């Protein structure tokens, strides 16, 4: 959940988001070290007299500034590729959900069950109850079990949308005529909010996403009430 004036990421609720946070910290440390080196070099140039103005060849320096950037690129690329493969890996999902984007609402279909489809519209400000969040609440939440691998199929019936839930590390484009997929596995129950992250028209800002993650036994009871 995001907080007012928050400067960092939301708390991770899935293994993928935890990996993304580690990768962010790893990359940020490399950027900090490079920035420090550049600032140190600039300060030396400004505070010392010019030397080696007649140097025509510096083999050692050329070797360093060729090898060092290559090492830095490798240190960034390897963990990045690892996370990319993790995000695309879907092994024996326990549940499959099909998400369809519309202007301007979402439709969720639980493909493992018959006639298990519903629309999810934003709750208007006048209908909010105390404690609910403006522009983030919906009339029908997507209810999912925790600690189980879940596959989400994402597409659109009109224009480009993007199904995004930051705390789970999810962002999948909804493209008309194309079926994209992503996977999630929540580590703890709770309400998790997201929004459409692709400009899709006049009411783009009014396409919230709400996931209600609950233990499996409560999810089974919820299914019985919906079927």
UniProtKB/Swiss-Prot annotation:
The membrane topology of this protein is:
Multi-pass membrane protein
**Residues in the Mitochondrial intermembrane compartment per record:** 1-14, 88-227
Q: What is its EC number?
A: 7.1.1.9
Q: What is the similarity comment for this entry?
A: Belongs to the cytochrome c oxidase subunit 2 family.
Modified residue annotations for Phosphotyrosine: 218
* Spans through the membrane: 15-45, 60-87
Q: Which InterPro entries match?
A: CcO_II, CcO_II-like_C, CcO_II_C, Copper_CuA, Cupredoxin, Cyt_c_oxidase_su2, Cyt_c_oxidase_su2_TM_dom, Cyt_c_oxidase_su2_TM_sf
Q: Which residues lie on this side of the membrane: Mitochondrial matrix?
A: 46-59
Q: Coding gene?
A: MT-CO2
User: What is any one of the record's Gene Ontology cellular component terms?
Assistant: respiratory chain complex IV
Enumerate the PROSITE patterns for this protein.
COX2, COX2_CUA, COX2_TM
> What name goes with this protein?
Cytochrome c oxidase subunit 2
- What GO molecular functions are on record for this protein? copper ion binding; cytochrome-c oxidase activity
Q: Where does Mg(2+) bind?
A: 198
Give the binding site residues for Cu cation A2.
196, 198, 200, 204
Q: What does this protein do, in the record's words?
A: Component of the cytochrome c oxidase, the last enzyme in the mitochondrial electron transport chain which drives oxidative phosphorylation. The respiratory chain contains 3 multisubunit complexes succinate dehydrogenase (complex II, CII), ubiquinol-cytochrome c oxidoreductase (cytochrome b-c1 complex, complex III, CIII) and cytochrome c oxidase (complex IV, CIV), that cooperate to transfer electrons derived from NADH and succinate to molecular oxygen, creating an electrochemical gradient over the inner membrane that drives transmembrane transport and the ATP synthase.
Positions bound to Cu cation A1? 161, 196, 200, 207
Cofactor mode of binding and number, as noted: Binds a dinuclear copper A center per subunit.
Catalytic activity from the UniProt record = 4 Fe(II)-[cytochrome c] + O2 + 8 H(+)(in) = 4 Fe(III)-[cytochrome c] + 2 H2O + 4 H(+)(out)
Q: Provide the protein's localization.
A: Mitochondrion inner membrane
| Co-factor(s) | Cu cation
How would you classify this enzyme at the top EC level? translocase
Entry's Gene3D superfamilies? 1.10.287.90, Cupredoxins - blue copper proteins
One GO term under biological process is:
ATP synthesis coupled electron transport
């Amino acid at each position: 959940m995001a907080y007012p004036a928050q400067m960092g990421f939301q708390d991770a609720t899935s293994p993928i988001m935890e990996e993304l946070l580690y990768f962010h910290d790893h990359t940020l440390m490399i950027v900090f070290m490079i920035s420090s080196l550049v600032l140190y070099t600039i300060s030396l140039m400004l505070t010392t007299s010019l030397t080696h103005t007649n140097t025509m060849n510096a083999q050692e320096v050329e070797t360093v500034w060729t090898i060092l950037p290559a090492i830095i690129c490798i240190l960034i690329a390897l963990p990045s590729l690892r996370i990319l493969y993790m995000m695309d890996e879907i092994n024996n999902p326990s549940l499959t959900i099909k998400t369809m984007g519309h202007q301007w609402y979402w439709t969720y279909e639980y493909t493992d069950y018959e006639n298990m489809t519903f629309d999810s519209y934003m709750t208007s400000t006048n209908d909010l109850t105390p404690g609910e969040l403006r522009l983030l609440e919906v009339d029908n939440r997507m209810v999912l079990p925790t600690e189980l691998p879940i596959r989400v199929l994402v597409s659109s019936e009109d224009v480009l949308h993007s199904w995004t839930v930051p705390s789970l590390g999810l962002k999948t484009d909804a493209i008309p005529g194309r079926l994209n997929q992503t996977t999630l596995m929540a580590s703890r129950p709770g309400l998790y909010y997201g929004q459409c992250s692709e400009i899709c028209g006049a009411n783009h800002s009014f396409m919230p996403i709400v996931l209600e993650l609950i233990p499996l036994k409560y999810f089974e009871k919820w299914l019985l009430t919906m079927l």
